Design a protein with these regions (language model features):
Chain A
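Conserved N-terminal entry element of GNAT/NAT acetyltransferase domains
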Residues: 1-24, 179-182
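Intrinsically disordered, low-complexity terminal tails and inter-domain linkers enriched
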Residues: 4-10, 120-132
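Acetyl-CoA-dependent GNAT
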Residues: 19-102, 108-113, 117-124, 163, ...
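Short hydrophobic/aromatic beta-strand or adjacent loop that forms the aromatic wall/cage
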Residues: 63, 172-176
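A short, glycine- and basic residue-enriched loop/turn
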Residues: 87-89, 150, 161, 167, ...
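Short aromatic/hydrophobic contact patches that present stacked aromatics
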Residues: 94-96, 137-139, 176
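Conserved beta-strand-loop-alpha-helix junction that forms the acyl-donor binding cleft
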Residues: 102, 127-149, 167-172
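Conserved active-site tyrosine of GNAT-family acetyltransferases
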Residues: 153, 158
Length: 182, 182
Protein backbone atom coordinates (compact mmCIF):
# COMPACT_ATOMS: atom_id res chain seq x y z
CA UNK A 1 0.00 0.00 0.00
CA UNK A 2 1.31 3.43 -0.87
CA UNK A 3 1.67 5.52 2.28
CA UNK A 4 0.18 8.61 0.70
CA UNK A 5 -1.74 9.17 -2.52
CA UNK A 6 0.34 11.13 -4.97
CA UNK A 7 -1.14 14.50 -5.83
CA UNK A 8 -0.51 15.30 -9.45
CA UNK A 9 -1.56 18.47 -11.20
CA UNK A 10 -0.09 20.29 -14.15
CA UNK A 11 0.82 23.98 -14.13
CA UNK A 12 1.00 26.48 -16.98
CA UNK A 13 4.78 26.62 -16.53
CA UNK A 14 4.85 22.94 -17.44
CA UNK A 15 5.65 21.86 -13.89
CA UNK A 16 3.91 18.93 -12.24
CA UNK A 17 2.88 18.92 -8.58
CA UNK A 18 3.52 15.66 -6.71
CA UNK A 19 2.85 14.67 -3.08
CA UNK A 20 5.26 11.75 -2.85
CA UNK A 21 8.77 12.21 -1.45
CA UNK A 22 11.85 10.82 -3.20
CA UNK A 23 15.36 10.03 -1.94
CA UNK A 24 16.77 12.83 -4.12
CA UNK A 25 14.48 15.45 -2.54
CA UNK A 26 16.74 16.46 0.39
CA UNK A 27 19.38 17.63 -2.10
CA UNK A 28 16.68 19.34 -4.18
CA UNK A 29 15.36 21.19 -1.12
CA UNK A 30 18.89 22.34 -0.26
CA UNK A 31 19.24 23.71 -3.79
CA UNK A 32 15.83 25.41 -3.84
CA UNK A 33 16.02 26.98 -0.39
CA UNK A 34 19.66 27.95 -0.84
CA UNK A 35 18.94 29.61 -4.21
CA UNK A 36 16.54 32.10 -2.63
CA UNK A 37 19.33 33.79 -0.64
CA UNK A 38 16.85 34.35 2.17
CA UNK A 39 17.99 31.84 4.72
CA UNK A 40 20.94 31.26 7.01
CA UNK A 41 22.86 28.01 6.57
CA UNK A 42 21.34 26.61 9.77
CA UNK A 43 17.88 27.33 8.43
CA UNK A 44 18.66 25.52 5.16
CA UNK A 45 19.84 22.58 7.27
CA UNK A 46 16.50 22.55 9.10
CA UNK A 47 14.60 22.54 5.80
CA UNK A 48 16.64 19.57 4.60
CA UNK A 49 16.21 17.72 7.90
CA UNK A 50 12.43 17.81 7.56
CA UNK A 51 12.62 15.97 4.21
CA UNK A 52 15.10 13.48 5.64
CA UNK A 53 12.82 12.86 8.60
CA UNK A 54 9.89 12.26 6.27
CA UNK A 55 11.96 9.77 4.27
CA UNK A 56 13.21 7.91 7.36
CA UNK A 57 10.04 7.98 9.48
CA UNK A 58 7.32 8.11 6.85
CA UNK A 59 3.90 9.35 7.93
CA UNK A 60 4.97 9.17 11.59
CA UNK A 61 6.99 12.31 10.89
CA UNK A 62 3.72 14.18 10.24
CA UNK A 63 5.56 16.23 7.62
CA UNK A 64 3.78 16.46 4.29
CA UNK A 65 5.29 17.75 1.08
CA UNK A 66 4.28 18.97 -2.32
CA UNK A 67 6.99 19.28 -4.94
CA UNK A 68 6.74 21.11 -8.27
CA UNK A 69 8.79 19.22 -10.84
CA UNK A 70 9.88 20.69 -14.14
CA UNK A 71 11.26 18.02 -16.47
CA UNK A 72 11.41 15.72 -13.43
CA UNK A 73 13.54 18.21 -11.49
CA UNK A 74 12.06 19.94 -8.38
CA UNK A 75 11.89 23.73 -8.73
CA UNK A 76 9.68 24.52 -5.75
CA UNK A 77 8.03 22.88 -2.78
CA UNK A 78 5.80 23.28 0.23
CA UNK A 79 6.07 21.47 3.59
CA UNK A 80 3.23 21.41 6.09
CA UNK A 81 1.71 19.28 8.82
CA UNK A 82 -0.90 19.03 11.55
CA UNK A 83 -0.03 20.76 14.83
CA UNK A 84 0.01 18.19 17.65
CA UNK A 85 -2.72 18.53 20.30
CA UNK A 86 -4.91 20.67 18.03
CA UNK A 87 -8.07 19.85 16.12
CA UNK A 88 -7.50 20.95 12.55
CA UNK A 89 -4.67 23.48 12.92
CA UNK A 90 -1.74 23.13 10.54
CA UNK A 91 1.66 24.72 10.24
CA UNK A 92 3.00 25.61 6.82
CA UNK A 93 6.67 25.05 7.62
CA UNK A 94 8.23 25.94 4.27
CA UNK A 95 7.20 27.19 0.90
CA UNK A 96 9.91 28.09 -1.59
CA UNK A 97 10.44 28.42 -5.31
CA UNK A 98 13.88 28.26 -6.90
CA UNK A 99 15.21 31.76 -7.63
CA UNK A 100 15.38 30.95 -11.35
CA UNK A 101 11.63 30.24 -11.44
CA UNK A 102 10.17 32.96 -9.20
CA UNK A 103 7.53 35.34 -10.55
CA UNK A 104 5.82 32.59 -12.53
CA UNK A 105 2.93 32.15 -10.09
CA UNK A 106 4.30 28.83 -8.94
CA UNK A 107 4.35 29.93 -5.28
CA UNK A 108 0.63 30.76 -5.42
CA UNK A 109 -0.02 27.44 -7.10
CA UNK A 110 1.91 25.50 -4.44
CA UNK A 111 0.06 27.38 -1.69
CA UNK A 112 -3.34 26.64 -3.25
CA UNK A 113 -2.47 22.95 -3.69
CA UNK A 114 -1.16 22.75 -0.11
CA UNK A 115 -4.39 24.25 1.25
CA UNK A 116 -6.47 21.92 -0.92
CA UNK A 117 -4.46 18.95 0.38
CA UNK A 118 -4.89 20.01 4.03
CA UNK A 119 -8.63 20.53 3.50
CA UNK A 120 -8.98 17.11 1.88
CA UNK A 121 -7.55 15.43 5.02
CA UNK A 122 -3.93 14.30 4.95
CA UNK A 123 -3.11 10.88 6.41
CA UNK A 124 -2.19 10.98 10.09
CA UNK A 125 0.69 9.12 11.73
CA UNK A 126 -1.43 5.95 11.74
CA UNK A 127 -2.28 6.30 8.04
CA UNK A 128 -5.92 7.18 8.59
CA UNK A 129 -7.05 10.51 7.11
CA UNK A 130 -7.16 13.47 9.48
CA UNK A 131 -10.20 15.75 9.63
CA UNK A 132 -10.05 18.73 7.26
CA UNK A 133 -7.75 21.58 8.25
CA UNK A 134 -9.55 24.54 9.86
CA UNK A 135 -6.65 26.96 10.20
CA UNK A 136 -3.17 27.32 8.72
CA UNK A 137 -0.32 29.17 10.43
CA UNK A 138 2.89 30.52 8.95
CA UNK A 139 5.69 32.01 10.99
CA UNK A 140 8.15 34.54 9.63
CA UNK A 141 10.51 37.27 10.67
CA UNK A 142 9.83 41.00 11.06
CA UNK A 143 13.12 41.90 9.38
CA UNK A 144 12.46 44.23 6.41
CA UNK A 145 14.17 41.88 3.95
CA UNK A 146 11.17 39.57 4.40
CA UNK A 147 8.77 42.21 2.97
CA UNK A 148 8.30 40.23 -0.30
CA UNK A 149 7.45 37.17 1.81
CA UNK A 150 4.84 39.10 3.81
CA UNK A 151 3.27 40.40 0.61
CA UNK A 152 3.14 36.86 -0.80
CA UNK A 153 1.33 35.55 2.29
CA UNK A 154 -1.06 38.51 2.22
CA UNK A 155 -1.87 37.93 -1.46
CA UNK A 156 -2.64 34.32 -0.48
CA UNK A 157 -5.18 35.52 2.11
CA UNK A 158 -3.09 35.30 5.28
CA UNK A 159 -3.16 38.03 7.93
CA UNK A 160 -0.87 38.73 10.88
CA UNK A 161 -2.51 37.33 13.97
CA UNK A 162 0.34 37.79 16.44
CA UNK A 163 3.76 39.38 16.81
CA UNK A 164 6.26 38.07 19.36
CA UNK A 165 8.77 40.80 20.13
CA UNK A 166 12.49 39.98 19.97
CA UNK A 167 11.64 36.31 19.37
CA UNK A 168 14.38 35.38 16.88
CA UNK A 169 16.89 37.85 18.31
CA UNK A 170 16.89 41.31 19.84
CA UNK A 171 15.09 43.50 17.28
CA UNK A 172 13.87 40.52 15.24
CA UNK A 173 10.25 39.71 16.02
CA UNK A 174 8.24 36.66 14.99
CA UNK A 175 5.14 37.34 12.91
CA UNK A 176 2.45 34.68 12.96
CA UNK A 177 0.27 34.71 9.87
CA UNK A 178 -3.01 32.80 9.92
CA UNK A 179 -5.78 31.88 7.51
CA UNK A 180 -9.07 30.13 8.14
CA UNK A 181 -9.80 27.46 5.53
CA UNK A 182 -13.30 26.52 4.48
CA UNK B 1 31.92 12.89 31.19
CA UNK B 2 28.47 13.56 32.50
CA UNK B 3 26.32 15.01 29.72
CA UNK B 4 24.84 17.71 31.94
CA UNK B 5 25.76 18.98 35.39
CA UNK B 6 23.19 17.94 37.94
CA UNK B 7 21.43 20.87 39.53
CA UNK B 8 20.79 20.17 43.18
CA UNK B 9 18.99 22.50 45.56
CA UNK B 10 16.94 21.80 48.65
CA UNK B 11 13.41 23.16 49.20
CA UNK B 12 11.58 23.89 52.45
CA UNK B 13 9.23 20.98 51.70
CA UNK B 14 12.24 18.70 51.91
CA UNK B 15 12.30 18.09 48.17
CA UNK B 16 15.53 18.16 46.18
CA UNK B 17 15.77 19.64 42.67
CA UNK B 18 17.85 17.66 40.19
CA UNK B 19 18.73 18.29 36.53
CA UNK B 20 19.65 14.73 35.55
CA UNK B 21 17.10 12.41 33.94
CA UNK B 22 16.60 8.83 35.11
CA UNK B 23 15.08 5.77 33.41
CA UNK B 24 12.21 5.83 35.92
CA UNK B 25 11.26 9.42 35.05
CA UNK B 26 8.86 8.68 32.16
CA UNK B 27 6.60 6.77 34.57
CA UNK B 28 7.00 9.54 37.16
CA UNK B 29 5.98 12.19 34.62
CA UNK B 30 2.92 10.16 33.67
CA UNK B 31 1.94 10.00 37.34
CA UNK B 32 2.56 13.70 38.02
CA UNK B 33 0.85 15.05 34.88
CA UNK B 34 -2.00 12.57 35.17
CA UNK B 35 -2.62 13.49 38.83
CA UNK B 36 -3.39 17.10 37.95
CA UNK B 37 -6.56 16.15 36.07
CA UNK B 38 -5.80 18.98 33.63
CA UNK B 39 -4.69 17.11 30.58
CA UNK B 40 -6.16 14.83 27.96
CA UNK B 41 -4.62 11.38 27.62
CA UNK B 42 -2.89 12.39 24.38
CA UNK B 43 -1.32 15.36 26.15
CA UNK B 44 -0.03 13.11 28.94
CA UNK B 45 1.46 10.88 26.25
CA UNK B 46 3.27 13.88 24.75
CA UNK B 47 4.70 14.82 28.16
CA UNK B 48 6.01 11.27 28.61
CA UNK B 49 7.46 11.18 25.09
CA UNK B 50 9.61 14.23 25.79
CA UNK B 51 11.30 12.44 28.73
CA UNK B 52 11.73 9.29 26.64
CA UNK B 53 13.28 11.32 23.84
CA UNK B 54 15.70 12.94 26.28
CA UNK B 55 16.68 9.50 27.61
CA UNK B 56 17.17 8.00 24.14
CA UNK B 57 18.79 10.98 22.36
CA UNK B 58 20.48 12.79 25.23
CA UNK B 59 21.37 16.44 24.69
CA UNK B 60 20.57 16.12 20.96
CA UNK B 61 16.90 16.12 22.03
CA UNK B 62 17.35 19.72 23.30
CA UNK B 63 14.88 18.90 26.08
CA UNK B 64 16.05 19.88 29.54
CA UNK B 65 14.42 18.79 32.77
CA UNK B 66 14.36 19.68 36.43
CA UNK B 67 12.78 17.19 38.79
CA UNK B 68 11.73 17.82 42.39
CA UNK B 69 12.31 14.63 44.39
CA UNK B 70 10.80 13.99 47.81
CA UNK B 71 12.37 10.97 49.46
CA UNK B 72 13.86 10.11 46.06
CA UNK B 73 10.41 10.13 44.39
CA UNK B 74 9.60 12.84 41.81
CA UNK B 75 6.66 15.05 42.87
CA UNK B 76 7.04 17.82 40.29
CA UNK B 77 9.05 18.77 37.23
CA UNK B 78 9.75 21.34 34.56
CA UNK B 79 10.73 20.71 30.93
CA UNK B 80 12.21 23.42 28.74
CA UNK B 81 14.54 23.94 25.81
CA UNK B 82 16.00 26.39 23.34
CA UNK B 83 13.81 27.27 20.35
CA UNK B 84 15.61 26.30 17.11
CA UNK B 85 16.67 29.18 14.85
CA UNK B 86 16.43 31.74 17.66
CA UNK B 87 19.11 33.47 19.69
CA UNK B 88 18.22 33.01 23.33
CA UNK B 89 14.50 32.20 23.15
CA UNK B 90 13.30 29.20 25.14
CA UNK B 91 10.05 27.30 25.41
CA UNK B 92 8.87 26.11 28.79
CA UNK B 93 7.11 22.97 27.56
CA UNK B 94 5.80 21.61 30.84
CA UNK B 95 5.72 22.53 34.49
CA UNK B 96 3.64 20.39 36.83
CA UNK B 97 3.41 19.48 40.49
CA UNK B 98 1.66 16.33 41.68
CA UNK B 99 -1.85 17.09 42.92
CA UNK B 100 -0.95 15.83 46.40
CA UNK B 101 1.82 18.44 46.69
CA UNK B 102 0.25 21.54 45.15
CA UNK B 103 0.00 24.76 47.14
CA UNK B 104 3.40 24.26 48.74
CA UNK B 105 5.22 26.77 46.53
CA UNK B 106 7.00 24.00 44.68
CA UNK B 107 5.74 25.24 41.29
CA UNK B 108 7.25 28.68 41.94
CA UNK B 109 10.47 27.04 43.05
CA UNK B 110 10.66 24.88 39.90
CA UNK B 111 9.96 27.93 37.72
CA UNK B 112 12.69 29.97 39.42
CA UNK B 113 15.20 27.12 39.11
CA UNK B 114 14.26 26.59 35.45
CA UNK B 115 14.80 30.29 34.69
CA UNK B 116 18.09 30.27 36.58
CA UNK B 117 19.20 27.21 34.59
CA UNK B 118 18.24 28.80 31.24
CA UNK B 119 20.05 32.02 32.21
CA UNK B 120 23.16 30.09 33.22
CA UNK B 121 23.40 28.56 29.72
CA UNK B 122 22.21 25.00 29.24
CA UNK B 123 24.35 22.67 27.11
CA UNK B 124 23.40 22.64 23.44
CA UNK B 125 23.07 19.57 21.23
CA UNK B 126 26.87 19.50 20.86
CA UNK B 127 27.42 19.70 24.62
CA UNK B 128 28.78 23.25 24.58
CA UNK B 129 26.89 25.76 26.73
CA UNK B 130 24.34 27.95 24.95
CA UNK B 131 24.26 31.72 25.50
CA UNK B 132 22.00 32.85 28.34
CA UNK B 133 18.26 32.77 27.67
CA UNK B 134 16.75 36.17 26.81
CA UNK B 135 13.10 35.25 26.63
CA UNK B 136 10.91 32.38 27.81
CA UNK B 137 7.60 31.42 26.22
CA UNK B 138 4.76 29.33 27.62
CA UNK B 139 1.74 28.28 25.60
CA UNK B 140 -1.59 27.47 27.17
CA UNK B 141 -5.28 27.29 26.41
CA UNK B 142 -7.92 30.00 26.78
CA UNK B 143 -10.40 27.54 28.28
CA UNK B 144 -11.63 28.84 31.67
CA UNK B 145 -10.50 25.71 33.50
CA UNK B 146 -6.93 26.91 32.92
CA UNK B 147 -7.53 30.07 35.02
CA UNK B 148 -5.37 28.75 37.92
CA UNK B 149 -2.58 28.10 35.38
CA UNK B 150 -2.81 31.65 34.00
CA UNK B 151 -2.64 33.06 37.53
CA UNK B 152 0.42 30.92 38.27
CA UNK B 153 2.24 32.21 35.18
CA UNK B 154 1.26 35.77 36.00
CA UNK B 155 2.54 35.45 39.58
CA UNK B 156 5.81 34.22 38.05
CA UNK B 157 6.08 37.42 35.97
CA UNK B 158 4.75 36.16 32.62
CA UNK B 159 2.34 38.24 30.54
CA UNK B 160 0.15 37.32 27.57
CA UNK B 161 1.96 38.43 24.42
CA UNK B 162 -0.31 36.82 21.84
CA UNK B 163 -3.62 35.03 21.43
CA UNK B 164 -4.27 32.74 18.46
CA UNK B 165 -8.00 32.40 17.96
CA UNK B 166 -9.48 28.89 17.62
CA UNK B 167 -5.97 27.40 17.63
CA UNK B 168 -6.59 24.22 19.64
CA UNK B 169 -10.18 23.85 18.46
CA UNK B 170 -13.12 26.06 17.59
CA UNK B 171 -13.59 28.29 20.66
CA UNK B 172 -10.29 27.22 22.23
CA UNK B 173 -7.59 29.84 21.66
CA UNK B 174 -3.86 29.55 22.30
CA UNK B 175 -2.41 32.07 24.75
CA UNK B 176 1.30 32.74 24.47
CA UNK B 177 2.83 33.97 27.71
CA UNK B 178 6.29 35.54 27.61
CA UNK B 179 8.87 36.82 30.08
CA UNK B 180 12.15 38.62 29.44
CA UNK B 181 14.97 37.22 31.59
CA UNK B 182 17.85 39.32 32.77
Amino acid sequence: MSEQPTVTASHPSGSIIRGSVQPTDPAAVREIVGSTGFFHDFEVDVAVELVQERLSRGLASEYHFLFADLNAHPIGYACFGPIPCTQGSFDLYWIAVHAAHQGSGLGRRLMAEAERTMLAGVPGADGRPLPPARRVYIETSSQPRYAPTWRFYERCGYTIEARLKDYYAAGDDKLIYAKALS
